[in-house]
């Protein structure tokens, strides 16, 4: 009886890992940088554009490219791939 319960627990554990893996798949966020004028970022406009264009959410961050000015903010959109 003890072996049967251990096997059933192992089967349930494997099944739950498979279901969790399939559920997470496809929900890995992608990142896209949107162009903005005057090196400024309006959070509400960024959020609205990302929701409309990518069905995701946006946030304002400093640029990550070498030629970006230090004080400039850019809109980055996070959306499901």
Curated annotation (Swiss-Prot):
UniProt superkingdom: Eukaryota
Entries under Pfam families matching the protein: SLR1-BP (PF07333)
Transmembrane intervals: none
Signal peptide: 1-26
GO cellular component entries: extracellular region
Disulfide bonds: 30-81, 41-60, 46-75, 50-77
Primary localisation category: secreted
Alphabetical keyword list: Antimicrobial, Disulfide bond, Fungicide, Plant defense, Secreted, Signal
Name recorded for this polypeptide: Defensin-like protein 153
Organism whose genome encodes this protein: Arabidopsis thaliana
């Amino acid at each position: 009886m003890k072996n049967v319960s251990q096997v059933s627990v192992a089967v349930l554990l494997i099944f739950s890992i498979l279901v969790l893996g399939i559920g997470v798949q496809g929900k890995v966020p992608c990142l896209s940088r949107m162009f903005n004028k005057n090196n400024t970022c309006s959070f509400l406009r960024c959020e609205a554009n990302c929701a409309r264009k990518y069905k995701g959410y946006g946030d304002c961050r400093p640029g990550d490219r070498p030629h970006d000015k230090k004080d400039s903010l850019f809109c980055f959109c996070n959306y499901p791939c």
